[in-house]
Amino acid sequence: MKRIGIISDTHGTFDDTLREFLKDVDEIWHAGDIGSLELADTIASFKPLRAVSGNIDGGLTRRVYPDFLAFECEGVRVLMTHIGGYPRHYNPRAAAKIQALHPKLFIAGHSHILKVVYDPVYDLLHVNPGAAGEYGFHKVRTAVRLVIDGADMRDME
């Protein structure tokens, strides 16, 4: 069993509010627009970090963090990217990766809008954690926590 914190669009922000929300997770997964390699290092020193780069991330961050990251957690196949779209409207690169890798959990950021939806076409859970940072049009900063226990994804908040 692992407790996962999912964030995106921090744009250079990782403050006490986020630390408090994420203090009990086992890992943090960041869906891009980190803000800097230094901020990624700060997050990684707080909790183990898996991350992808986003459209505002510079060259150094892009060299360390890929556009797409595929991995398994507790037997659940995960695919994460920054700009992925939504069910029935995935961007072409994300759709190709989903079709090739068959993830059960697809995570994307970019929109700054928190949205969790089941995709019946690809039989996956799509999670966009919204924006955890202070910059952008969003009015409320958001992040997601969930438990992955075998094939069971639960206790999402």
What are these regions (language model features)?
Residues 6-8, 27-33, 50-55, 79-82, ...:
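Active-site neighborhood of phospho(di)ester-bond hydrolases with catalytic His/Asp-centered motifs
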Residues 43-45, 98-101, 121:
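Short, conserved loop/helix-junction motifs that constitute active-site signature segments
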Residues 57-102, 134-135:
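Active-site-proximal segments of metal-dependent phosphoesterases and phosphodiesterases across multiple
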Residues 12-16, 34-39, 56-61, 85-90, ...:
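Active-site environment of divalent metal-dependent phosphoester hydrolases
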Residues 21, 72, 98, 117-119, ...:
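Solvent-exposed alpha-helices and their adjacent loops that cap or buttress functional pockets
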Residues 69-70, 115-118, 142-146:
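Short beta-strand scaffold segments in enzyme catalytic cores
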Residues 1-49, 57-75, 139-142:
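N-terminal active-site segment of His-dependent metallophosphoesterases
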Residues 2, 73-74, 101-102, 127-157:
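Binuclear metal-dependent phosphoesterase catalytic core
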